[in-house]
Regions:
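Short beta-strand->alpha-helix linker/helix-N-cap micro-motif
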Residues: 27-90, 103-108
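Amphipathic beta-strand/beta-sheet edge segments enriched in Tyr/Trp
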Residues: 22, 85-152
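Residue position within the beta-strands of beta-propeller blades
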Residues: 104, 168-173
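Conserved beta-propeller blade repeats
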Residues: 142, 156, 194, 201-205
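Bacterial N-terminal signal peptides
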Residues: 7-15
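Short loop/turn segments that connect beta-strands within beta-propeller blades
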Residues: 125, 188-192
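Predominantly a core beta-strand signature of beta-propeller blades
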Residues: 129-132, 192-196
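Structural motif
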Residues: 112-116, 176-185
């Protein structure tokens, strides 16, 4: 399997010591999903603009699938990514969207062609940064970085380890009923990055 080059280059997080810490209690029987706003990431210095939109979409889908989060509709957003970078976060306006947490990010293309991905998680009511990290990676690895960021957000807000940066190994079966071909395959937990590990010539139980 190809070696994955992923470098964590910076830890930006601070624990918010608010009167009531923003946290989902996963031990409760019935949980109301937490409203969370996940903005597009700001693309700087030649960074891929498509990725700046695709990464937040993957993060949003991951968190929503967990059943613990309810992403705010982007049409309700009160600031663009450019506005956040230039003016800072206008927390009072974000509170009007009912979002309890806010995710922002920045993509930068480095001189050696790699991509620097930075994200920050904010408590909208205390106006505090809850956590944040930056990663150096290849552009083609953007989807995995989105899963890693999803895990960081999930852990910070639930206290439990995330599972989004995990992969599923399974037996793929196809062909006519009398000549079925079984191959060992692997994919991300969300069904993307599917690859076959065997060619179907050998027996797979």
């Amino acid at each position: 399997m190809k070696h994955l080059y992923l470098t964590l280059i910076l830890f930006l997080g601070f624990t918010a010591h608010a009167h009531a810490e923003l946290r989902i209690d996963v031990t409760r029987g019935t949980i109301e999903p937490m409203p969370i706003a996940i903005t597009s990431f700001h693309a700087e210095q030649g960074a891929n603009g498509a990725i700046s939109n695709d990464m937040p979409q993957v993060i949003s889908e991951n968190l929503e699938r967990s059943g613990l989060f309810k992403p705010v509709n982007p049409r309700a957003f009160v600031q663009s990514t450019q506005s956040i970078v230039k003016e800072g976060i206008r927390f009072a306006e974000w509170r009007a969207t009912n979002a309890q947490a806010l995710v922002t990010g920045v993509l930068t293309r480095t001189n050696d062609g790699r991509t620097r991905v930075e994200f920050r998680l904010w408590d909208v009511f205390s106006e505090k940064q809850l956590t944040g990290m930056a990663y150096m990676t290849s552009e083609s690895n953007w989807r995995r970085i989105a899963h890693i960021i999803s895990d960081e957000i999930y852990k910070r807000l639930t206290g439990e380890d995330g599972y989004f940066d995990s992969r599923i190994v399974y037996v793929s079966e196809n062909g006519p009923p009398t000549a079925r071909v079984k191959r060992l395959a692997i994919m991300d937990q969300d069904g993307f990055n599917h690859k076959y590990l065997t060619d179907g010539k050998n027996l797979v139980l």
